[in-house]
Amino acid sequence: MKKIFIVLGNQLFNPSYFEKFRNDHLFFICEDFQLCTYQKHHKHKILLFLSAMRSFADELKKKKFEVIYKYIEERDFKESYIDKLFKEIEKKNVKEISMFEVEDKFFEKQLLDNLKELKLNYLKSPMFLNSRNDFKTYLNQVKKPFMANFYKKQRVDHNILVDSNNKPVGGKWSFDDENRKKLPKKIDLPEKFTFKETQHTKVLKEIVEKMFHHHPGKTKSFWTCTNRKDTESYLDYFLDKKIENFGDYEDAVDQRD
């Protein structure tokens, strides 16, 4: 009996998180019309998600995962996510589903309501420091939840930039008043990070432009990495070239950069 692991477009985690499910699960990844259009998302956002999903599917396939992938070009693209999922469930006679927690509450309810008749392994998301139960426990411990107090608690609980007495490194919990500087006119900015556009992005640019023509933006100006290799290189570039002055200028917006 086959099982299905549902992977959503914002759950493209390192394949190591999926490894223990590789041998007995099919991995279902679906480009979904409703998720692209429930708001008039900028074309760049749609292109980013779709191209990244395709690159992620390639990554899984190279590691011998068995992937069911539903493309925007397919005739049933505008059918609901649930309908497309259940076509595969019925076709493969699937009785068990695995997936990570869904952060979109409306979509989560829709999915869980429809999966009630199947065995469901609902897994803690690796996307966050805390579990859902951690946060519920915190809410039960305080009379009024404040972001600043929760932030301090996280720093202490996870030993992030605190000393042996759980006091903040640097003497303050927040340096917000020091990170709102404008970029000086004569500052030397690092050269922009460059990377090669993937074939998926090239193909999808025209498709997104046509199918979502009423959405804002132009795909020709898309500039974002869409696969793990380029994104990790971009992070290395940021740590090497930009982090030194990031704190001072993190709120600055400037056409030079």
Labelled PLM ranges:
Residues 1-72:
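N-terminal beta-strand-loop-alpha-helix module at the start
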Residues 10, 32, 72-74, 102-104, ...:
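An acidic- and aromatic-residue-enriched active-site/binding cleft used to recognize and process polar
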Residues 13-15, 35-38, 76-77, 105-107, ...:
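Flexible loop/turn segments at secondary-structure boundaries
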Residues 37-43, 68-71, 216-224, 251-257:
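Glycine- and acidic
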Residues 40-44, 98, 102, 222-233:
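Generic amphipathic alpha-helical segments used as scaffolds and interaction surfaces in large
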Residues 58-66, 90-95, 227, 243:
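Short, solvent-exposed loop/edge-beta patches enriched in aromatic
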Residues 78-224:
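Beta-rich, aromatic/charged-enriched effector core domains that present basic-aromatic interfaces
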Residues 230-257:
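Gly/Thr-rich phosphate-binding loop signature of adenosyl cofactor/nucleotide-binding cores
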